[in-house]
């Protein structure tokens, strides 16, 4: 440990691991797909469409560009972290109470927030055996137990997921379309689960 000018302490790399939670030490790092420029250079191609990260290959619509240009003068201010306007629009569109809506900055953020808010140590979190890896990693970070259900023809086996519910189950993750298999389940199938 070395002190530095600001009055705090700098901990060398060999000590950093001692600060990390055991639940995080056991996780394999998430490795995202290669950046577009790297793929272009490696394979000597000009156009790459990256589907793995849900990126829009067409860019913003003109409507979005117009809205952004109108907001440029207030870009120095923090946005509404409670997403009041967005919640009001969603509530109006689906005729539900705005207090039932939870917004976040992308799925990674929402998954993490759900796990931190809902899961206690040793609670169970049900998911497909092959699905978005953030469900399992965030479940493990909070000390909960991922319950992985085998796939059925590369699809989430919804019936088996429902059968796996116990008194320790706090979260069931339905990825639709499922990442990485791309398979889907219908609205009718989902409603049948909710009604159980």
Model-inferred region functions:
Residues 1-15:
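N-terminal amphipathic/basic-hydrophobic helices that include classical n-h-c signal peptides
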Residues 76-195:
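Conserved core of the PLP fold type I
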Residues 4, 25, 38, 73, ...:
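Alpha-helical structural elements
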């Amino acid at each position: 440990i070395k002190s530095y000018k600001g009055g705090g302490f700098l901990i060398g790399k060999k000590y950093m691991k001692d600060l990390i939670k055991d639940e995080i030490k056991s996780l394999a790092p998430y490795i995202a797909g290669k950046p577009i420029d790297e793929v272009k250079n490696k394979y000597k191609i000009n156009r790459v469409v990256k589907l793995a990260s849900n990126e829009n290959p067409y860019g913003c619509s003109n409507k979005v560009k117009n809205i952004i240009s109108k907001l440029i003068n207030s870009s120095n201010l923090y946005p509404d972290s409670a997403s009041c306007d967005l919640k009001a629009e969603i509530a109006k569109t689906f005729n539900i109470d705005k207090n039932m809506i939870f917004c976040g900055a992308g799925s990674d953020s929402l998954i993490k927030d759900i796990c931190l808010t809902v899961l206690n140590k040793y609670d169970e979190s049900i998911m497909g055996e092959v699905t978005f890896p953030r469900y399992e990693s965030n479940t493990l970070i909070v000390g909960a137990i991922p319950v992985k259900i085998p796939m059925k023809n590369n699809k989430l086996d919804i019936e088996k997921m429902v059968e796996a519910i116990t008194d320790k189950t706090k979260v069931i993750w339905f990825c639709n379309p499922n990442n990485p298999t791309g398979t889907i389940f219908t609205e009718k199938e989902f409603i049948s689960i909710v009604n159980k």
